[in-house]
């Protein structure tokens, strides 16, 4: 199994993280020392399946106090490789110092460490592909029965976002590459650009950015995660890949004017 190795510092929300389409193409490693403490339930999914290539933990909880199944049973049912017994915090420090790594996980015992390193070096970065097209909805669907009309670009949206918006709005979820004409037919009061995986500056996303450039002149727009980056590109900004991603809760945010750091 090959993938981009990333880490998450949250203490809870392991199911939400693993089913988040933003992690498509990646191997997710948790820094919290034990994962699966409260079991696994279908209600915690952010999409229809686990989106990561694999999962790495220091230890998984054998006897959770609740849940329909334990962490290992869940990964097996979803056919996702899991690796236990790794000092994930030490590996996270290495990742933080060297930058995001490409990784290979082997289960057959036939691949030597040297062969694994070679395969990792030859591996393409997941963001070289158009991951948005892979995780986006293939057809339009609607949620919510009252309130303003929100047209939501699904670039890998978490279902909790759709659910929360639908509580007080009428939400139309559309595929990643919906055209300007198709968007206008949905009669939006607001355009919402979702989270998602990959590179916002990917060549196949150029037309999307151009569409947003036109739409922001006519409609109120909101972007979150990847959507925020796409909106930035549409407004003339630039994006670049961080040395390592910031994934987890309580992210520090620095006010560059006052030099004050806030915890979100």
Residue locations for each model-derived region?
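RNA-binding accessory domains that recognize and position tRNA/RNA substrates
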Residues: 1-163, 167-181, 185-186
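Cysteine-nucleophile active-site neighborhood
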Residues: 190, 194-263
């Amino acid at each position: 199994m090959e993938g981009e190795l990333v880490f998450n510092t949250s203490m809870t929300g392991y199911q939400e993280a693993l089913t988040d389409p933003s992690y498509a193409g990646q191997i997710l490693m948790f820094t919290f020392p034990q994962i699966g403490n409260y079991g696994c339930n279908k209600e915690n999914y952010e999409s229809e399946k686990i989106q990561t290539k694999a999962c790495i933990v220091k230890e998984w909880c054998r006897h959770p106090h609740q849940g329909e199944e334990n962490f290992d049973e869940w990964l097996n049912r979803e056919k996702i490789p899991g690796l236990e017994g790794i000092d994930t915090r030490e590996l996270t420090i290495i990742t933080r110092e060297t930058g995001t790594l490409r990784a290979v996980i082997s289960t057959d015992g036939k691949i030597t460490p040297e062969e694994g390193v070679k395969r990792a070096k030859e591996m393409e970065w997941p963001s070289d592909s158009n991951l948005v097209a892979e995780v986006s909805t293939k057809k339009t669907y609607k949620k919510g029965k009252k309130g303003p009309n929100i047209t939501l670009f699904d670039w890998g949206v978490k279902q909790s976002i759709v659910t929360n918006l639908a509580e007080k709005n009428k939400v139309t979820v559309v595929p990643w590459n919906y055209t300007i004409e198709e968007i206008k037919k949905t009669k939006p009061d607001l355009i919402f650009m979702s989270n998602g995986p990959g590179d916002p500056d990917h060549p196949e996303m150029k037309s999307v950015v151009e569409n947003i450039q036109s739409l922001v002149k006519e409609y109120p727009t909101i972007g979150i995660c990847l959507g925020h980056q796409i909106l930035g590109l549409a407004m003339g900004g630039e994006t670049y890949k961080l040395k390592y991603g910031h994934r987890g809760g309580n992210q520090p945010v620095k006010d560059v004017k006052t030099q004050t750091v806030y915890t979100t």
